[in-house]
A protein has these predicted regions:
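Flexible, glycine/charged-enriched surface loops at secondary-structure junctions
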Residues: 27-30, 162, 239-248, 274-275, ...
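Glycine-rich beta-alpha junction loops
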Residues: 34-37, 140-142, 168-172, 193-196, ...
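Metallocofactor- and cofactor-centric catalytic cores in central/energy metabolism, strongly enriched
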Residues: 1-130, 144, 148, 152-157, ...
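Short catalytic-loop micro-motif centered on adjacent basic/acidic residues
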Residues: 30-32, 113, 134-137, 163-165, ...
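Phosphate/pyrophosphate-binding betaalpha-module
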Residues: 136, 140-203
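Structural motif
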Residues: 85, 132-134, 188
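Internal helical hairpin/lid segments
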Residues: 227-316
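A conserved active-site cap/scaffold subdomain adjacent to cofactor or substrate pockets
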Residues: 163-165, 182-249
Length: 358
C-alpha cells in the first residue's frame, strides 16, 4: 500500500538496526510516552530487534489509564443524580473505580452514553434541554482542541445544560517528573507523534536544557520507530542532547498554533492528577473565568472516598517502574474480559498490550 509499505521496508529496517547496534556502546534506557508507540513496538517485534544494551520502558502514554480513581468515582456519583446524562468515550466505560464502573452503573439504569467526539455532547444537550449533560473530558493535548471548540460553541449557543468533567492532561510536565525519578534513570525519550502535532517542539526544550537528555518526536510505523531510536542512540553516543523530529511528514516545530490558541482561549495550565503519580503542577488544565460555569466539579455531589485495588500495579506500570508480568494479577484474574485496573482496559494500556502481544 503506497505511503505505508515504504515505512515497513525490511532492507531499510536492517540498515537502521545495524546502525543502532554500532552506535550503542553502553546500557541505555529509552522511554516511549505514547500508547500507540507501545502497541507498534510490540506488534512489530521491535524490542527483539534491538541490541541487549537498549531497554525500552513504557511510560504514561494512555489517557484512560492515567485518569485517577477520584475522577472515575466523581463521574459515577454524577451518573447517580436525577436528570443527569453522562457522555463519555467508550474506553472509560469499563475502567474500574473504587467500587463500581460506568458500565456497571449503566446496567443499573443510569443514563450513560458512548460518544466518539466531544461535539456529540452538544447534540445530546440540545435534544434534552430538561437534563444536565456531563461530558467526561479526558485526553492529552491531541484531544484538547476539540474539547475547547465544543465549550466555545456551547457558550456561543448559550447552552445552560452542558458541563465538562475536566480530566485532561499535559504531557511535558509529567516528563519532568519521570526524569527526576531515581528509580528509572531515563537516557532519552521517544516523544509522542500525535501530541507533538499540536504542541510542536518548544514545550520539550526543558528536557535537554535542564536534564541534558535527548528526545526524538517519532512516528508510528516500524521504520519511524527504528529511526527514532537510532537518532537517540547517536545523540547519546555523541554526548549531545536536543529535541529532534523524526516524524517530519506530520510534525512541525511550531506545532499547530490555531489548535493551541483554541485550547488557551478556554483553559489555562493547572494542576493535574495522575494515577500512581499524584498531583503534578501545570500538568492539567483549569477553566478560564468565562467558562467556569461549565465545570462539572461545581456540582454538589457526595463522592465516596477513593481507593485502589491493593494488588494492582497499574500506577507503577505507568511510570515504567514495573512491567505487567511483575503484577500478581496479570493474566490470572486481570485480563481484557475482567480488567482489574485501567492499564488492562484501554487498547493503548501497557497491560493490555503485553497481554495481546507477549
Amino acid at each position: 500500500m503506497k505511503f505505508i509499505d515504504e515505512f515497513r521496508d525490511k532492507e531499510i529496517a536492517q540498515g537502521l538496526i545495524q546502525g543502532i547496534r554500532k552506535t550503542t556502546t553502553r546500557p541505555v534506557q529509552l522511554m516511549e510516552v505514547c500508547g500507540t508507540h507501545t502497541v507498534s513496538i510490540f506488534r512489530y517485534g521491535i524490542r527483539d530487534m534491538l541490541p541487549e544494551q537498549i531497554r525500552l520502558l513504557s511510560g504514561p502514554g494512555c489517557p484512560v489509564c492515567v485518569t485517577p480513581n477520584t475522577d472515575i468515582d466523581f463521574a459515577i456519583a454524577l451518573s447517580r443524580q436525577e436528570k443527569v446524562i453522562i457522555a463519555t468515550f467508550g474506553d472509560m466505560m469499563r475502567v474500574p473505580g473504587s467500587t463500581s464502573s460506568l458500565q456497571n452503573e449503566k446496567a443499573e439504569g443510569r443514563d450513560i452514553r458512548i460518544i466518539n467526539s466531544s461535539l456529540e455532547a452538544l447534540r445530546i444537550a440540545e435534544e434534552h434541554p430538561e437534563k444536565k449533560v456531563v461530558f467526561l473530558a479526558i485526553g492529552f493535548e491531541t484531544t484538547s482542541p476539540t474539547i475547547a471548540v465544543a465549550i466555545l460553541r456551547a457558550r456561543e449557543e448559550r447552552m445552560k445544560n452542558l458541563f465538562f468533567l475536566n480530566s485532561q492532561k499535559r504531557v511535558p510536565p509529567v516528563l519532568a517528573t519521570l526524569l527526576q525519578s531515581k528509580e528509572l534513570g531515563i537516557d532519552g525519550f521517544i516523544l509522542p507523534g500525535h501530541v507533538s502535532t499540536i504542541i510542536g517542539t518548544r514545550p520539550y526544550q526543558f528536557i535537554p536544557r535542564e536534564f541534558a537528555r535527548p528526545g526524538v518526536i517519532t512516528g508510528f510505523e516500524p521504520l519511524d520507530i527504528l529511526q527514532g531510536i537510532w537518532m537517540l542512540a547517536r545523540q547519546i553516543a555523541e554526548n549531545r542532547a536536543s529535541v529532534e523530529i523524526q516524524y517530519r511528514r506530520v510534525v512541525r516545530e511550531e506545532g499547530n498554533p490555531v489548535a493551541m490558541e483554541k485550547i488557551y482561549e478556554v483553559f489555562k495550565d493547572g494542576e493535574g492528577h495522575w494515577r500512581g503519580m499524584g498531583s503534578i503542577p501545570d500538568s492539567g488544565y483549569g477553566f478560564r473565568e468565562p467558562y467556569r460555569e461549565m465545570d462539572a466539579r461545581n456540582f454538589d455531589v457526595e463522592v465516596e472516598p477513593s481507593k485502589e485495588h491493593p494488588l494492582c500495579l497499574c500506577g507503577e506500570v505507568l511510570q515504567g517502574i514495573r512491567t505487567p508480568p511483575e503484577c500478581r494479577l496479570f493474566k490470572v484474574v486481570c485480563h481484557p474480559e475482567n480488567p482489574v485496573g485501567p492499564c488492562m482496559v484501554s487498547v493503548e494500556g501497557t497491560c493490555h498490550t503485553y497481554y495481546k502481544f507477549q
